[in-house]
Every structure is written in structure tokens, then in C-alpha cells.
Amino acid sequence: MDNIAGKVVVITGASSGIGEATAKRLAEKGAKLVLAARREDRLKALADEIVRLGGEAAHAVADVASAEDMRKTAGLAMERYGRIDVLVNNAGIMPVSRLSELRVEDWDRMIDVNVKGVLHGIAAVLPVMREQRSGHIVNLSSTSGYAVSPTSVVYGATKFAVRAITDGLRQEESAASGIRATLVAPGLTETELLNGLTSPEARAIAERIKGLGMSPDRIADAIVYAIGQPDDASVSEIIVRPTALAM
């Protein structure tokens, strides 16, 4: 993994779960981090911990649904480190429910965060990476981006969209500008994603599968693997599923 040391990595959704685990793994490998999320207290605590252990980290309070917030986050990376080598588009939400429940506000928010948020991240870093003629964008999808299931229709649709965006980015930029694109699709992972469920049916499903998910460290390891590959190799797609679940 010698290809990670010194790289400037922007991570969204860095205050907990996969984002936090990825930040810690990359800091151990010598990356310079810009951590973005909405919860400043969690971000600052993580950045302080990384610095205390000898790493480098800055943080920016940002909502990926805001294109301006993502531009400011990229600006912080450029001001602090002068380049952006990697973006980990990790932020996401999962207030799942059946379509018949008509939770339109949840649908809108999932589209804003899970789809527009990915695009806002790309828009913030792509000009920099094109000028550098190098870079790597890692987008977090889900196994729900491969198969639709009841209660997960809109969430799955957002993750199908992330797959399409990532593959399109790869086709447009890889050969033309040397920018790599990787899709990482986790199955059930022990994060905060299920904490905000309001649908009674979805809460019941979450309770049945509680404790069967993977540690966020497993997904962080996959992200680190993709980033650490030599520049002449591009890991296009990684799916990681928990052993305890067939779904």
C-alpha cells in the first residue's frame, strides 16, 4: 500500500461508520485527510485523534446536498495541501419504506444526499483532478444497487444511480485524464444508517437483522485496497457482503 502515503484524501460522511473507519485506516497509511460531515463535534474529535497519533487531518462542516458546501470543502483541501488526490464519496442516508407509505420527504432527501451529493462531490474535485491529470474518486453504493427489494425501492434506485455515475465517470475520465473511478458496494454494515428509520415495517426488518452486519473496518479495508493500487491499475468495482446474510 505504498501508493497511499502523502496522498490528499477528502472523505464525506467522515464523522462515523465507514467514513470514520476509512479515515483512520488512511491516516495509518500516511494520507493527508480532509474530513467532511455535518456534525462538527464528531469531526473535530476525529481530526484531533488523527493528529495526536501523528497523522494529518483538517475538517470541514459540510452537507453533501449543498454544492456550495462541497466546493468549500475542496477549497479547504487546496488551501491546506495544494492538491486533491482522492475523493471518497461516502455520505449517505437510508430512511427506507414501501412506496405505498408515500414518504415523499424521505425520497427527496435520499435523492439529494445519495445521488446529488455524489455529483456535488465530483463537481467539486473534478476540475482540480483534470488539471493535475490524476486523481481517484471512490463512490459508495450498496448491494441494494444490484437488486431491488420491498421497502428499499427508492434507496435502491439511488444506489443504482451511483453505479451508473461511477461507470460513466470511469469511461469519460480514465484514459482521457488519468482519473480513476471505483464503486464500493457494501452489504449490511454496522453503521448509523438504520438508526433513523420511521417506517414500522422497516424498523421491524432492521431489528431482525441486528447484529448480522459487518464492521465498518471491512469496508474501509476495501477502500484502502482500491486507493493503494499502482497508478496503472484501476479497481472498478468491489462488493463486500456479510458472511451471516445471503442478501
Label for each model-derived stretch:
Residues 40-41, 61-73, 104:
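The beta1-alpha1 cofactor-binding region of Rossmann-like NAD(H)/NADP(H)-dependent oxidoreductases
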Residues 122, 158:
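Active-site helix of classical SDR
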Residues 179, 183-184, 203-247:
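C-terminal helical subdomain
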Residues 8, 15-16:
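Conserved glycine-rich cofactor-binding loop
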Residues 31-46:
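Conserved glycine-rich Rossmann-like NAD(P)H-binding loop of the short-chain dehydrogenase/reductase
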Residues 142:
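Residue(s) in the substrate-gating loop at a strand-loop-helix junction
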Residues 98-99, 106-111:
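Substrate-binding pocket helix/loop in short-chain dehydrogenase/reductase
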